[in-house]
Amino acid sequence: MAAKDVKFNTEARNKMLKGVNILADAVKVTLGPKGRNVVLDKSFGAPRITKDGVSVAKEIELEDKFENMGAQMVKEVASRTNDEAGDGTTTATVLAQAIVREGMKSVAAGMNPMDLKRGIDLATAKVVEAIKAASRPVNDSAEVAQVGTISANGESEIGRQIAEAMQKVGNEGVITVEENKGLETETDVVEGMQFDRGYLSPYFVTNADKMIAELEDCMILLHEKKLSSLQPMVPLLEQVIQSQKPLLIIAEDVEGEALATLVVNKLRGGLKIAAVKAPGFGDRRKAMLQDIAILTGGQVISEDLGMKLESVTMDMLGTAKKISITKDETTIVDGAGEKAEIEARVAQIRTQIEETTSDYDREKLQERVAKLAGGVAVIRVGGMTEVEVKERKDRVDDALNATRAAVQEGVVVGGGVALVQAGKVLADLEGANADQTAGINIVRKAIEAPLRQIAENAGVDGAVVAGKVRESGDASFGFNAQTEEYGDMFKFGVIDPAKVVRTALEDASSVAGLLITTEAMVADKPQKDAPAGGGMPDMGGMGGMM
């Protein structure tokens, strides 16, 4: 085992604080509408330019092991906030730095670190309660756009497109962000359920120009296994022909004789029909077929449940207003499923999302929720160069996460003002002893840090701005860094999601509390380079040979 280097007390804390400051100073220049960019070097390709706090934090590794520990702990703050709220990573980093800095001063002055931490935790809980109480629900699409605009660093076009996408697919719908090949940023919306399986034969096409099969007011047969013969289905097909409605067959596969029979019937004009493979594989395929069944009000014909094709009746089929099938994908619009059943299914999948530990499974489950609940929107981000596209995509991702958070827990005044106003609840709060009260005061000072930093980045004195906001009796009074005006932040349209502000403070105080209570640090000793191998030693004369 390699030898370890151990540092104690003040020496350990100072090293750690240095690492915290290096990382936080690099991240905090991005905060606010007038925050600057950070350029990240890449081992290949062009450097990346970003204003995303967590992207900057993730790039930082320090040479000194002890300083690096401090930096990594603050990186954890940014990552946790990003995972929980999707935005607010820079705010969380600035808060963590402020709490650690003030806390270290108090520890150096001889206060008990554990009591300081208890005071910090108590104050954080009170401020979080105040933030929740001050939160108000998002009422309309204009407010959603404002949240998106603020998070995208004042680019109103991004806010507008996100609001538009959310309006179309609903709050439960999935919105994905991709890179566009062109200059423009566009939004595509797919309503209804879409899955990536196309028609099994081009003969099913109804619109030869577009090469798509369109079925209006359509019946849907969902079958779990392969169909190789249509013989068991003949009674059902006769009923479908009499009803004069089109039929879509979704099965594991339709092959050989069965497919040929369907194509011949379609070409003769007796049956409006199409067939596609079921989406997904294995257990996920079963679950997705069940989703389609609930969405369309039908049943999955499954041998596990003792159902046979011979006994299928018309009332076991699902129905949908419109189905369109291309060679690659199928879209079911306006299924006839019961709303209550769809909601119950969504709730069931949500429970699975909370319980799963796999990111891949979570993503697939979220897609299923979106397909059941509303639809899917894709925002394609454009730009002149690859570097610009990547930078904009970072901002669109942040803005999208912020708007989702706003819809979940409502909004509060932006620009760091919500924290300062919520901090007023700490004015008369006292801990069980003097050290706990000192911990409460650490939080009271630290929660002004984001407001100060936003002002500093706009070229204004942060202390003056913080003083004015603190002394104001109006809860929504603040400083608009974009226009450098004081006034009602709601009227300026400067609003933040309550969830983002809350999460940033909780994560920052949690990790900062751990840093303050650190008394010793252990790291691997740097390896000394071994000296270069010399030549072979002198072997002396070999003596005379006989």
Swiss-Prot record:
**Which regions are flagged for Gly residues bias?**
532-546
**Keyword annotations of the record:** ATP-binding, Chaperone, Cytoplasm, Isomerase, Nucleotide-binding
Which GO terms fall under biological process for this protein?
protein refolding
Can you tell me which residues bind ATP?
A: T30, L31, G32, P33, K51, D87, G88, T89, T90, T91, G415, D496
The cellular location(s) given in this protein's UniProt record come to: Cytoplasm
Among its keywords, does the record have ATP-binding?
Answer: yes
- The enzyme's E.C. designation: 5.6.1.7
Q: Which cysteines are joined by disulfide bonds?
A: none
Q: What class of enzyme is it?
A: isomerase
Give the UniProt entry's GO cellular component terms. cytoplasm
Q: Which PROSITE patterns match?
A: CHAPERONINS_CPN60
Catalytic activity line of the entry: ATP + H2O + a folded polypeptide = ADP + phosphate + an unfolded polypeptide
The UniProt function text for this chain reads: Together with its co-chaperonin GroES, plays an essential role in assisting protein folding. The GroEL-GroES system forms a nano-cage that allows encapsulation of the non-native substrate proteins and provides a physical environment optimized to promote and accelerate protein folding.
Family per record: Belongs to the chaperonin (HSP60) family.
Subunit architecture: Forms a cylinder of 14 subunits composed of two heptameric rings stacked back-to-back. Interacts with the co-chaperonin GroES.
Q: Which HAMAP family match?
A: CH60
Q: What is this protein called?
A: Chaperonin GroEL
- According to its UniProt entry, this protein's organism is Ruegeria pomeroyi (strain ATCC 700808 / DSM 15171 / DSS-3)
